């Protein structure tokens, strides 16, 4: 999470936010959990799979900001993070690391601020979990209100996002795909643009902002 927090929005994030401000995009549904669309200025935004900047209690549902949790974890485990950094641990693409057993044994978990449970997790949808009902409802509302669906920079490999494409097509709405490589929705797309996402969105901005 700390590495992701240091990431900055790219030209595609900013272009989508500008297209929304110009009225060409009615909202953004993202599979990403990095919060970069919000930082770029997208206002009507649904993070379908959650946001790593939030923590949720598995017992009572109370949520907490990740920075707040980090502060509490640092207080409960003084010097722990510095010792880990000295190890120069390799972080896997999914964010996991392999730790020696003594690091796990010595770690003190902090409780939920509401119920005291220590069963806390990032507020993201892991593989095998379902998208929460309230997010599905917002997704349905956004899809019902739009006139077309634009898929940007995604292979649409996950079923929760592929379903959005299928739902749009069933509703008779055109689906456009912009992506630099092949994806699951390509064969069903009304329009397919195989190119870099940032460049494509800037060309769209030029066409809209006249």
What is the predicted function of each stretch?
Residues 1-210:
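Conserved catalytic alpha/beta core of Sir2/sirtuin-type deacylases, generalized to analogous enzyme cores
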């Amino acid at each position: 999470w700390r590495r992701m927090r240091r990431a900055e929005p790219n030209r595609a994030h900013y272009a989508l936010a500008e297209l929304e401000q110009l009225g060409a995009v009615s909202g953004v549904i993202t599979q990403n959990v990095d919060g970069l669309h919000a930082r770029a200025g997208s206002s009507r935004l649904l993070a379908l799979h959650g946001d790593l900047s939030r923590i949720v209690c598995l017992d009572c549902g109370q949520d907490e900001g990740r920075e707040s949790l980090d502060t509490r974890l640092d207080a409960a485990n003084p010097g722990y993070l510095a010792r880990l950094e000295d190890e120069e641990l390799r972080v896997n693409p999914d964010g996991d690391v392999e730790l020696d057993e003594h690091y796990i044994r010595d770690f003190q978990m902090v409780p939920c601020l509401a119920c005291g449970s220590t069963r806390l997790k990032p507020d993201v949808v892991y593989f095998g979990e379902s998208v929460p009902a309230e997010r599905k409802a917002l997704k349905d509302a956004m899809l019902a209100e739009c006139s077309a669906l634009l898929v940007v920079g995604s292979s649409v490999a996950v079923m929760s996002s592929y379903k959005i494409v299928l739902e749009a097509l069933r509703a008779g709405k055109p689906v456009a795909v912009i992506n630099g490589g092949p994806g699951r929705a390509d064969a069903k797309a009304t329009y397919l643009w195989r190119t870099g996402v940032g460049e494509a969105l800037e060309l769209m901005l030029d066409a809209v902002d006249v």
